[in-house]
């Protein structure tokens, strides 16, 4: 069975069930960034989008905790989610680990939203995911006392490192392609004005301009200029170092949350008193998501009034009245919430090092980037060759990390 009822809670028991959870998680976690990028490209403020996303992300955690962690009889060895909420005076060290992991995820996701605009969906996800795997997987391997096969696991880590190099080369080559396209259209690529966009399309009304933009060929210079005038975060002419710096920061933040969640549920550092049951996955995920939600709301309300990276200023009233794209933002939160929950459920059974295989989500994100946004359309042959190489290495990497999965023998003692 993939999911079994054990001592009143539902747990993933088999290696096959764990891998299925990880594959579903991979699909969810690879899709939600595409929705965030879509809204930014349509002009919705990132602060508005992230606040909506945070609400449903937290609701998904509550649903998972109550449905999978609160059904059945609670015992001392395996208390239910509800029971563990009343035991915080005993299990608070593990709760703090879980909440610290949530802070790391929230800051990482927030940074990702801005890096998506600066360096694109594919390169952002490749770089951030690879840093997460290299740092987080190594830490998880030692926390799990070698639960995963080291030879296979670290071969996968090596493939991710190669993919990072190829991803950087893809971005460099694609940036050169874009510069060449814009150079043919205008001698000044650092300044894009509405007047130039109007000259391209020969329209005056915004609605007509949007209609004309749909008819512009993806990847063309005209398309790039029209997109720049429409999007919420202006990026043309900005230093590539800014975007890459944000992406590296996001990756380092992401690399912390999985090891911290591992410590919260397995207590490898023996911070709990003898006889105190470890946090079940669902309780840890609830506290993890709670801190993620609080940090996200606090930071983004602040960013409404004091925006970063030249984003437009807003207010809480304007956020409440902004229904343009809200459904997509709420959907992104659900995808991320359920994706994280599935990752942790699979990781508890197969080992958290193997669960980091979901960091191969750039495979999914790159598909959406090419299909939805026309990334790399009309690029050079060199860019296409590097892109294929990057995707091949990611495919090999995720296969190796999943093949390294072990099975955890003890969960509740």
Curated annotation (Swiss-Prot):
Its main location: membrane. GO terms for molecular function: allantoin:proton symporter activity; ATP binding; protein transporter activity; uracil transmembrane transporter activity; xanthine transmembrane transporter activity. Keywords: ATP-binding, Membrane, Nucleotide-binding, Transmembrane, Transmembrane helix, Transport. The keyword Nucleotide-binding applies. Pfam families: Ureide_permease. Expressed in lateral roots, rosette leaves, stems, stipules, flower stigma, pedicels and the connective tissue between pollen sacks. Residues 1-18, 72-91, 137-149, 262-278, 348-352, 406-413 are extracellular. It is a multi-pass membrane protein. One of its GO terms (cellular component) is secretory vesicle. GO terms for biological process: nitrogen compound transport; response to salt stress. The chain crosses the membrane at residues 19-39, 51-71, 92-112, 116-136, 150-170, 241-261, 279-299, 327-347, 353-373, 385-405. InterPro entries: UPS_plant (IPR030189), Ureide_permease (IPR009834). The keyword Hydrolase does not apply. Optimum pH is 4.7. Residues 40-50, 113-115, 171-240, 300-326, 374-384 are cytoplasmic. Disulfide bonds: none annotated. It is found in: Membrane. ATP binds at residues 232-239. Proton-coupled transporter that transports a wide spectrum of oxo derivatives of heterocyclic nitrogen compounds, including allantoin, uric acid and xanthine, but not adenine. Mediates transport of uracil and 5-fluorouracil (a toxic uracil analog). Belongs to the plant ureide permease (TC 2.A.7.19) family. This is Ureide permease 5. It comes from Arabidopsis thaliana. The lineage of its organism: Eukaryota, Viridiplantae, Streptophyta, Embryophyta, Tracheophyta.
């Amino acid at each position: 069975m993939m999911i079994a009822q054990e001592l009143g809670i539902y747990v993933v028991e088999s290696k096959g069930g764990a891998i299925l959870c990880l594959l579903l998680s991979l699909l969810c976690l690879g899709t939600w960034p595409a929705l965030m990028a879509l809204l930014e490209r349509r002009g919705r403020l990132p602060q508005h989008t992230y606040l909506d996303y945070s609400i449903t992300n937290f609701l998904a955690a509550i649903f998972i905790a109550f449905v999978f962690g609160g059904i059945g009889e609670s015992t001392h060895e395996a208390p239910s989610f509800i029971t563990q909420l009343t035991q915080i005076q005993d299990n608070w060290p593990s709760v703090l680990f879980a909440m610290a992991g949530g802070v790391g995820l929230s800051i990482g996701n927030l940074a990702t939203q801005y890096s998506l605009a600066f360096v694109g969906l594919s390169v952002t996800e490749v770089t951030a995911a690879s840093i997460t795997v290299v740092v987080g997987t190594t830490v998880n391997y030692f926390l799990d006392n070698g639960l995963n096969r080291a030879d296979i696991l670290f071969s996968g880590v090596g493939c991710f490192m190669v993919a990072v190099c190829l991803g950087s080369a893809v971005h460099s080559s694609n940036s050169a392609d874009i510069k060449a396209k814009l150079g043919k259209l205008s001698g000044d690529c650092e300044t894009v004005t509405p007047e130039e966009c109007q000259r391209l399309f020969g329209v005056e009304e915004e609605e007509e301009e949007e209609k004309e933009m749909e008819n512009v060929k993806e990847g063309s210079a005209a398309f790039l200029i029209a997109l720049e005038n429409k999007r919420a975060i202006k990026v043309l002419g900005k230093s590539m170092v800014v975007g890459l710096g944000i992406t590296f920061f996001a990756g380092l933040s992401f690399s912390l949350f999985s090891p911290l969640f591992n410590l919260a549920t397995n207590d490898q550092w023996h911070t709990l008193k003898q006889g105190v049951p470890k946090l079940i996955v669902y309780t840890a995920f609830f506290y993890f998501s709670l801190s993620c939600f609080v940090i996200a709301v606090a930071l983004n309300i602040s960013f409404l009034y004091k925006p970063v990276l030249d984003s437009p200023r807003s207010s809480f009233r304007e956020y409440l009245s902004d229904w343009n794209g809200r459904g997509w933002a709420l959907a992104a939160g659900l995808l991320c919430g359920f994706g994280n929950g599935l990752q942790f459920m699979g990781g508890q059974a197969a080992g958290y090092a193997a669960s980091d295989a979901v960091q191969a989500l750039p495979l999914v994100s790159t598909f959406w980037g090419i299909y939805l946004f026309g990334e790399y359309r009309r690029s050079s042959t060199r860019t296409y060759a590097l892109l294929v190489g990057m995707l091949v290495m990611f495919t090999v990497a995720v296969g190796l990390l999943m093949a390294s999965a072990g099975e955890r023998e003890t969960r509740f003692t």
